[in-house]
Amino acid sequence: MRMLDFFVFRDHLCIVFELLSVSVFDLLKENNYCGLSLNISRIIIEQILDAMRVVKEARLIHCDLKPENILFK
């Protein structure tokens, strides 16, 4: 994933990354909002937790964590 831009807004650093192809929301929508399998959910959650650990160690805050913003290549 490439960083495209960054800027400061109200004394907060904002970072813009490239848009990847599929989001968790897209997967849920394709599955008629019936959820995801346990195996897929585990994979996604493990990756989110790993990413959040990295974010915490870097002393950053993600202010908009939602299915639409969890993206896959």
Which stretches of residues belong to each language-model region?
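Short beta-strand micro-motifs within the conserved protein kinase catalytic domain, predominantly
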Residues: R2-L13
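Conserved alphaE helix
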Residues: D11-C14, L19-K73
